Amino acid sequence: MAAATLLRATPRFSGLCASPTPFLQGRLRPLKAPASPFLCRGLAVEAKKTYVRDKPHVNVGTIGHVDHGKTTLTAAITKILAEGGGAKFKKYEEIDNAPEERARGITINAAHVEYSTAARHYAHTDCPGHADYVKNMITGTAPLDGCILVVAANDGPMPQTREHLLLAKQIGVEHVVVYVNKADAVQDSEMVELVELEIRELLTEFGYKGEETPVIVGSALCALEQRDPELGVKSVQKLLDAVDTYIPVPTRDLEKPFLLPVESVYSIPGRGTVVTGTLERGILKKGDECELLGHNKNIRTVVTGIEMFHKSLERAEAGDNLGALVRGLKREDLRRGLVMVKPGSIQPHQKVEAQVYILSKEEGGRHKPFVSHFMPVMFSLTWDMACRVILPPGKELAMPGEDLKLSLILRQPMILEKGQRFTLRDGNKTIGTGLVTDVPAMTEEDKNIKWS
């Protein structure tokens, strides 16, 4: 279990996990991609504004069970900050903007908004809570520097509360602030106190500092409707203060060659194709040559424009949620899961050795052990790929709750390097979390593995 703690506590590798990038609305047409409300309508015409980097940039997001009020809270934050010029108010309907989301009343794809407090500039990801859309939630949490866990006071922690916390911890999100929502629906203050106690115990269970974590009680709906100031506006202001102070500004790796996992691909009439994502490391400039790798593709092109939240950038830095206009490509040429890199800086790999923690039944993992050649799906960066697990010589079974060294062979070569985190899923269960320790060459035996 000590090794499991190590895997969960290791800081997120700088070349990992990008998320949906909020930038294209209006006439832009996504290609098999999540709704990404924040990138740039402005790429269709010349951008009118330039992004000014005058505050530290931090990526945060709302996580939690379906219908606990994540999107309502996101809307309330923008409404309150808009009054001081720190945001543009985004209504609930603008955040949940995909037709299926509106029809079902739930968030399916991670959506994004931008806002600023007095101290910081934030890109905020509103992650889906419904169990059917955990895959999109994994992508949503991947680039986050910290999370706001939303728990309804009238429900307490629920199944997706646990799963979201588990996924956030697995991909290296180390700081969580809690908002106990819908407090206006609970008359008994003791019930709210019990919910807070249960949340702190849950945080501790998943390796967070449960006793130290800020917990703010309030009502996002009251804040949106500007009633009951103590539970409404003041609670959201307290939450923002807690996010400012408890979630640290991360150290960004600006020295290594740029790496941008592609979250979405869009076509802009009259201009071309845009890829969106969070720059995981390095600096990306207008005019840079780049390669797009993965999924058996190797495409070379040039970045002809960069935008973030409808503002143009001459250069993007690690941590920025951006859209990059690429020369001479059609949206059909590209897909989510590709990785944009400096030419020659990295190559896809099909085999890795890794330290892997297999989740126990109590942690939501498998009930039974598995053998060599078991085939889960590996999630890393913005891609997912079927893989074969090869147990060490002499090892017949991998048991739930066990920490061990494994070899994993992917169905197709993808971007993988030492220190990279990944998650293993089997059906609708997260079954393991791992860290790449080596990237060996494929043997003849490896090449003959059957995938049917």
Swiss-Prot record:
Record-listed Phosphothreonine modification sites: 278
InterPro entries, per database record: EF-Tu_GTP-bd, EF-Tu_GTPase, EFTu-like_2, EFTU_2, G_TR_CS, P-loop_NTPase, T_Tr_GTP-bd_dom, Transl_B-barrel_sf
Positions contributing to Mg(2+) binding: 71
Transit peptide residues according to the UniProt entry: 1-43
Region (G1): 64-71
UniProt-listed Enzyme Commission number(s): 3.6.5.3
Annotated GTP binding sites: 67, 69-72, 181, 184, 219-221
Entry-linked CDD domains: EF_Tu (cd01884), EFTU_II (cd03697), mtEFTU_III (cd03706)
Region (G5): 219-221
GO MF annotations in UniProt: GTP binding; GTPase activity; magnesium ion binding; translation elongation factor activity
Subunit structure and binding partners: Interacts with NLRX1. Interacts with ATG16L1.
Designated name of the protein: Elongation factor Tu, mitochondrial
